[in-house]
């Protein structure tokens, strides 16, 4: 019968998770699944694959080894609301044509809406063309295929349980489908076909082959593989099927939201990264694994302000690590601790120091976190969504924390990095990617407080002096009067210590000094916040700029042609 999953994944003893051998080195053992039930449906009303029998047997064997019971049928009459409720997942195994009548379709729709799972294998995409619900569920309909041949499958998501065991390039022989539409807009693509590796591809550079999605309350996984009998004897393909079934049945969690527009920071290459402090990270199979510490592997090539950062992580047991954001460049890992924020990875610490917490600042929603978390030994995916000084944390696609920074000494803008906590705290990371959101926030309407810029540093009157001509700089935020500015709503003077932010001599040349000066109402003291985060002097049309893109304390600010770069972005009160 359909069984409800009630166990917590935190603090569980590790047990052997039996799957047939994979093509890459085995990772740490994962917890055994609570028992569940799977319906395998293989009715055909068109072409019939000779691999259906061996495919059904393979799924039975996977079930026997991995905590699920299989019922196999080609009788569409089993599609009733009462009967389907017995199963956590339904596999459409090489179905073809119109296999369900309207009453049966309605029962299956109700099953999915109630949280059921769907797995489509190969010609499941050549099924039910006239049923729009099914078309949206499967993700794309079959269009054509060339002859059976060898091809390279490019695995772009190696956190999902269906693909985590696979290498970045998976070479195998099968019948390779072209589809009528690209599934990427509605599903998370897990793997694509490299059309340069075989003949007859018809979708170009982006040819999805396997994907997953959440759909109207349920879960769906589809793979284009599985035409040949030999497929079901391949250990890697069997594990691929198993992972898809586990996801559809709700036994493994994954972020299956559509994903586009991200830039890779790490997927095997460490270019642009630097190690701060002791310890290191090993780099093998496009996977970083922490060694020793306490140190920090940080992306030193660029700082970020408004962005979505995604990464995949796995810990083998009760381990400790975290993702740091919003810190200035430094070879000292404690700079990130003292100036930025850590989103924690730790199975068993206190609630404000465990997985999903903004370390010591705000606990995750523990119930939501536990429901979304895969246990030690399995991969998880974080999204850290930073918009101004607001941070939202998503675990496997589920929001588990929402935090707003109000500390004038810290900021969410700056560098990002991953922690190597110490010997024995072994956490691995994959596929670190980022999407910069740009000027998504409207300009402020005026207020009093700090003006934060590059690396979260504050606009500062040097030495808190009040003499006309005092240099303006950036400095670590400290809440002093030298960093307390009053911004005029809609544009105008920006004041601190009773005087105004001023362009020296009313100049317009790049590099003109920015200083403190007695307020005089001239254009040299007229500043307007822009939607892209810059602060523009209206008279010159140029921007307040941190010299040399240098975030060190004491770096001067000057006037410069507006570029929208990070050293011209300011968060105003």
Positions of PLM-derived features:
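Secretory targeting and sorting signals
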Residues: 1-32
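Low-complexity, Pro/Thr/Ser/Gly/Ala-rich linker/spacer regions in secreted
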Residues: 30-35, 249-264, 436-450, 490, ...
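A glycine-rich, often tryptophan-bearing local segment used as a flexible ligand/cofactor-contacting loop or short
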Residues: 92, 97-166
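Carbohydrate-interacting regions of secretory-pathway proteins
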Residues: 257-441
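Aromatic-rich beta-strand patches that line glycan-recognition/binding surfaces
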Residues: 321-331, 470-476, 512-518, 556-561
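Catalytic beta-strand/loop cores that center a nucleophilic Ser/Cys/Thr
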Residues: 140-217
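Extracellular ligand-binding/catalytic regions of CAZymes and related secreted enzymes
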Residues: 32-36, 42, 50-53, 57, ...
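Extracellular glycan-recognition/adhesion modules and their associated mucin-like linkers
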Residues: 441-466, 481-509, 523-551, 566-573
């Amino acid at each position: 019968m359909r069984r409800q999953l009630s166990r917590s994944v935190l603090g569980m003893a590790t047990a052997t998770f039996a799957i047939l051998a994979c093509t890459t080195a085995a990772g740490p053992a994962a917890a055994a699944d609570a028992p569940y039930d799977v319906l395998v449906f293989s009715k055909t009303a068109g072409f019939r694959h000779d691999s259906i029998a061996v495919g059904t047997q393979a799924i039975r064997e996977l079930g026997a080894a991995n905590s699920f019971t299989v019922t196999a049928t080609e009788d569409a009459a089993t599609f009733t609301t009462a009967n389907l409720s017995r199963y956590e997942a339904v596999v459409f195994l090489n179905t073809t044509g119109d296999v369900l009548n309207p009453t049966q379709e309605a029962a299956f729709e109700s099953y999915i809406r109630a949280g059921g799972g769907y797995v489509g294998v190969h010609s499941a995409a050549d099924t039910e063309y006239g049923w729009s619900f099914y078309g949206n569920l499967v993700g794309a309909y079959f269009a054509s295929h060339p002859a059976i041949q060898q091809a390279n499958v490019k695995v772009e998501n190696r956190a999902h349980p269906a693909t985590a065991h696979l290498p970045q390039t998976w070479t195998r022989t099968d019948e390779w489908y072209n589809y009528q539409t690209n599934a990427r807009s509605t599903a998370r693509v897990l793997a694509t076909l490299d059309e340069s590796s075989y003949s007859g591809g018809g979708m170009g550079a982006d040819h999805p082959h396997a994907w997953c999605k959440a759909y109207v309350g349920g879960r769906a996984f589809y793979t284009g593989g599985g035409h040949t009998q030999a497929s079901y004897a391949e250990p890697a393909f069997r594990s691929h099927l198993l992972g898809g079934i586990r996801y559809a049945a709700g036994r493994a969690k994954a972020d299956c939201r559509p994903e586009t527009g991200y830039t890779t920071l790490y997927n095997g290459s460490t270019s642009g990264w630097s190690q701060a402090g002791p310890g290191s990270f090993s780099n093998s199979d496009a996977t970083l694994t922490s060694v020793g510490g306490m140190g920090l592997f940080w992306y030193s090539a660029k700082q970020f302000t408004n962005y979505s950062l995604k990464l995949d992580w796995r810990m083998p047991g009760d381990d400790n690590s975290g993702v740091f954001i919003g810190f200035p460049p430094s070879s000292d890992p404690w700079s990130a601790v003292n100036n930025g924020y850590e989103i924690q990875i730790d199975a068993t610490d206190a609630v404000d120091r465990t997985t999903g917490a903004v370390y010591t600042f705000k606990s995750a929603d523990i119930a939501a976190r536990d429901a979304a978390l895969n246990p030690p030994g399995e991969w998880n995916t974080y999204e850290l969504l930073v918009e101004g000084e607001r941070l939202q944390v998503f675990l496997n696609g589920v929001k588990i924390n929402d935090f707003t920074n109000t500390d004038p000494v810290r900021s969410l803008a700056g560098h990002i990095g991953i922690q190597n906590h110490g010997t024995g705290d072994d956490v691995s990371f994959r596929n670190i990617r980022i999407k910069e959101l740009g000027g998504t926030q409207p300009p402020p309407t005026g207020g009093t407080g700090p003006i934060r810029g590059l690396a979260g540093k504050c606009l500062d009157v040097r030495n808190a002096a009040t003499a006309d001509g005092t240099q303006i700089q950036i400095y670590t935020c400290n809440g002093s009067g030298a960093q307390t500015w009053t911004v005029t709503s809609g544009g105008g003077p920006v004041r601190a210590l009773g005087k105004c932010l001023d362009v020296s001599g009313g100049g317009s040349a790049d590099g003109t000094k920015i200083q403190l000066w007695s307020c005089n109402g001239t254009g040299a003291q007229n500043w307007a916040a822009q939607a892209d985060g810059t602060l523009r002097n209206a008279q010159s049309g140029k921007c307040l700029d941190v010299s040399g893109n240098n975030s060190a304390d004491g770096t001067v600010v000057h006037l410069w042609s507006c570029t929208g770069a990070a050293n011209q972005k300011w968060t105003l009160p």
